[in-house]
Amino acid sequence: KALSTLKKKITIIDIVDKYADQSKCEKIGDLEYESFLNTGDENFDWKMPEDEWQAISLSYTSGTTGNPKGVVYHHRGSYLMSTGSAVAWNMPNRLNFLTIVPMFHCNGWGYPWTIPMLNGRTICLRNIDVKKIFELIDKYNVTHFGGAPIVLNMITGAPESDKKKLKQKVYVLTAGAPPPSIIFKKMNELGFEVMHVYGLTETYGH
């Protein structure tokens, strides 16, 4: 219905998510995401932006603290956010980063740019599963990850059988509404050091 109100036709790309309830999924586009990626040119001649203020991405927010809106990120802002995060979060060179925040959430809070800047390794988590989180932390010696407060709730409230003793301290960044103090306490007892930051789409996620 929303698309029918547009004066100009736009390209819609459907994402087929194997974790989603297919009975509730409806394809409304002409392209599927993986098929769309296959149309890319491996020999594409990449060009650097001519101006640091040029757009790098467009993020939409449902308006948790304001009206729904689209937010244009530019290269300068993304660079400053990346370097600022590295300093504020004390992120070392060649760290192992577990990606939990999805790209549709402020571009994964900008860490797809920050981690390469630090020569880091990104470990991808397609579906939020506490047991899998602990397994990946153990297998890849994960040192950092970001997650919304609900992720911290899931970790602290998971059955003991899903948890693993951490081999090293793991630094966690969470943004948005502050989690209850008991969540910070429980995360600390599990070996996580949590830093809470201000979450806002207009400020690149935090």
Cite the ranges covered by each PLM segment:
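Conserved S/T- and glycine-rich ATP-binding loop of Class I adenylate-forming
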Residues: 55, 61-64, 97, 103, ...
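Conserved structural elements of the adenylate-forming
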Residues: 38-43, 52, 57, 71-92, ...
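Conserved AMP-binding/adenylation subdomain of ANL enzymes
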Residues: 79-96, 104-144, 154, 158
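Conserved pre-ATP/AMP-binding loop-to-beta segment of ANL
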Residues: 13-14, 25, 29-31, 37-60, ...
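Gly/Ser/Thr-rich phosphate-binding loop
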Residues: 35, 89, 117, 142-147, ...
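Short beta-strand elements of ligand-binding domains
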Residues: 9-18, 173-174
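Short beta-strand->loop structural element characteristic of the AMP-binding/adenylate-forming
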Residues: 1, 69-72, 99, 121-127, ...
